Amino acid sequence: MTAAKIKVLCVDDSALIRSLMSEIINSQPDMEVVGTAPDPLVARDLIKRVNPDVLTLDVEMPRMDGLDFLERLMRLRPMPVLMVSSLTERGSEITMRALELGAVDFVTKPKLGIREGLLDYTQTIADKIRAASRARVRARAEQSAGAAPVAPMLRAPLLSTEKLIIVGASTGGTEAIKDFLTPLPPDSPAVMIVQHMPAGFTKSFAHRLNGLCRITVKEAEHGERVLPGYAYIAPGDSHLLLARSGANYVAHLSQEAPVNRHRPSVDVLFDSAAIHGGKNVTGVILTGMGKDGARGMLRMREAGAYNLAQDEQSCIVFGMPKEAIAAGGVHEVVPLHQMSQRVMAHLATFGARAQRV
């Protein structure tokens, strides 16, 4: 007996985009478009009729604001939503807000008239729809419940060995990273993060986090020193690596080929942390689709790092953590709301502030 196809409803005010999305989705053997809508009001009626598994939603819509529609949808009828965003500053800000409201993930709008690259784009959309269809989606009220307590400051004497927190995430990771970073104290060791995200969105992501956290959050720059009390987000379309300059840690950006079909890649960051950080590293792998980071986390463990993975129950998609656990790179499996505390508790076992200034 063949498995039922993933039912997709496409909502976009552009007839051309609706047509292209339908063509892409219907070309896949395991999914089909069961309806299209030019605006959220039409979509609202269609949802009741066709009961889709996944909704693709344009971030900027007529008649009803896309964010208003998403907020109501996640409160009244939670379902996996994949945002389709334009590559603009306004588009990236709206997309970040949509992810906060409960959207599972986003894709950028296809470049119309450019058939080259459409194959890669087709694969990306298909993969994200598959991941969305398996995502754990909760009502909004449930998502905001049980905020993590503030992690304790590290009050022990300074140690000459500088500690680092190295993080990888994908689908569902923007909110997971926020939940992980916000409890960290101002004297936290430096945090380096790869979140799968295209160019043009990571700066907005870092800016939004910076306004919420007690540490400074920024998009990583090539050659800058990696300092305690800072979190560095890998820029979209660039690998982020840990490097050394004398006794100091520095950020290194690379345009080398994608790894595991991703640039930035979690494995690339984790591999560099294994080489240059070793036992000074605490590794964290959060919600995400695929296996990026699994091999790198094992290499970090073999180099002396202590690694934690988000548990299945709190993941939007239990892909990357599951693969890292299966590969043998993980010491602890932890619910997201306890992750910051567990990381800081582990660092406290060093009996040191875990940083050098």
From Swiss-Prot:
The modification 4-aspartylphosphate is found at D58. One of its GO terms (molecular function) is protein-glutamine glutaminase activity. Phosphorylated by CheA. Phosphorylation of the N-terminal regulatory domain activates the methylesterase activity. It catalyses: [protein]-L-glutamate 5-O-methyl ester + H2O = L-glutamyl-[protein] + methanol + H(+); L-glutaminyl-[protein] + H2O = L-glutamyl-[protein] + NH4(+). The active site is at S170, H196, D292. Its EC number is 3.1.1.61, 3.5.1.44. Residues 158-350 form the CheB-type methylesterase domain. One of its GO terms (cellular component) is cytoplasm. Belongs to the CheB family. Contains a C-terminal catalytic domain, and an N-terminal region which modulates catalytic activity. This is Protein-glutamate methylesterase/protein-glutamine glutaminase 1. It comes from Cupriavidus metallidurans (strain ATCC 43123 / DSM 2839 / NBRC 102507 / CH34) (Ralstonia metallidurans).
